[in-house]
């Protein structure tokens, strides 16, 4: 136990963490953010690494009595890492990434997540169940999920995933579904509007299933008053595009006009809206949406980290100061 709460273990865990982040960067560059999340960021072993590193840093503080005045600079460094880890945890488990599509003179209060889900609904009870799934060029794992329906098990297992070949042939997912010893096989295509579902019947019970993102309702709406696209002189290439929107928050009796364009984002209600793309007829906008409750703790952690390093450099009790004498 004493070795686990040592500076040597801290160095080892931080080295593993740094290597994992570096590998994730290369994976993201070559295969996309979804592959990096599936293999590194959202993987159970990376969560465990966060936990071990946090416990190690807390243990080091107490085992080495860093609360002493002469060790305050080292204490600040350790506390900064702990705050950064807390911020990362908040982002991991409570953060949200998605998009919002709005046509001119229309309003939307719905975010469509980037993460894809498999959603199944029992018509008899109107109960719905959903769980995230992810298929990337590097992660095409078999999965099996069991759902309890009043004591009876509904088992959904993947058989084969076929990635998208071109713009005409979409990706497909072949599933086997078992209920009360009855089986059926279903082929799904990703459904990004959540309006198309597949119906099936097992042992007299009716179900629907679909594969696509989750829709999240916001407590406020955005109304697109106008979308403006500007082009380079003598060219059809867009130089900039702006979404002139109105925030409609009935709960707080707020109506506020705002322009969203490149490098000018909207922060409202804990969400951040970026200008992402637009419809081909130039009558609609596509906004990227981000909710990151770990952003502020992470910024605080990095600020403390910088202050801690500066303090260590000039602290008379630090090893750096003694070596410089």
Predicted regions and their residues:
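Internal alpha-helical transmembrane segments
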Residues: 38-117, 290-322
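Membrane-proximal extracellular juxtamembrane segment immediately upstream
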Residues: 23, 27-34, 41-44, 259-325
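Soluble non-transmembrane domains of integral membrane proteins
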Residues: 99-292
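Hydrophobic alpha-helical segments
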Residues: 1-41
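Active-site-proximal structural scaffolding
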Residues: 12, 51, 72-75, 79, ...
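Intrinsically disordered or highly flexible coil/loop and linker segments, enriched in small
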Residues: 6, 10, 28, 67, ...
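Hydrophobic alpha-helical segments with strong N-terminal bias
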Residues: 8, 27, 31, 64, ...
